[in-house]
Amino acid sequence: AERIKNWNIEKIYCSDLKRAMETAAIINETLNVNIVVESQLREIDFGEMTGHSDEENAKYFAFFQKKLKSRRCDLAYPGGECGADVYQRGFPVINKIVHGSTGNVAIVTHGGFIRCMLAGILGMDFAKKSMFGKNMENTSITELDYDTDSEMFTLERFNDYTHLEGKPELLRSSWK
């Protein structure tokens, strides 16, 4: 919150998943603006892989993960979503937020969702979304600028977590 307190954020939008709502509430202790919860900002649905450790998923879904890493096609997670599904679900709310705002907004969401939105917004094949990295740091900042004249987005910042410097316990690499 300290990092963005001077960015003139007019509203916070967040996913309806618990961790996103908790993060939005923490940010709002500093910003004191309205929070709007949008279910369409949820993380990609990992289907049958949800709730399992990376090790379990590597063991039980090895064939799927190998195909996913090939980046040849946009695969749906077993029983879940593919990148295009997430984009079709999420972009309408992003569009509504952009066109319904007069200033800066913060969107608190999830790494998989962000990668899918970026792939779609930047015109990439959804199979290539993993080019944005396997994991994003929690509380990292990805910044898009929307130009109303050209109706185009520009990626200004991606997975920026410099505000976590000096706090290694908060980084993914410290998780056991």
Regions found by a protein language model. Give the residues of each.
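Active-site-proximal alpha-helix that buttresses catalytic centers in soluble enzyme cores
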Residues: 1-33, 37
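Short, high-confidence coil segments that cap the C-terminus of an alpha-helix
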Residues: 9, 101-102
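Short beta-strand scaffold positions
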Residues: 14-15, 88, 108-109
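Acidic, low-complexity terminal tails and accessory targeting/binding regions
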Residues: 33, 44-56, 119-176
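Phosphate-handling substructures
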Residues: 29-91, 154, 175-176
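Active-site catalytic microenvironments for nucleophilic, acid-base chemistry
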Residues: 3, 30, 96, 100, ...
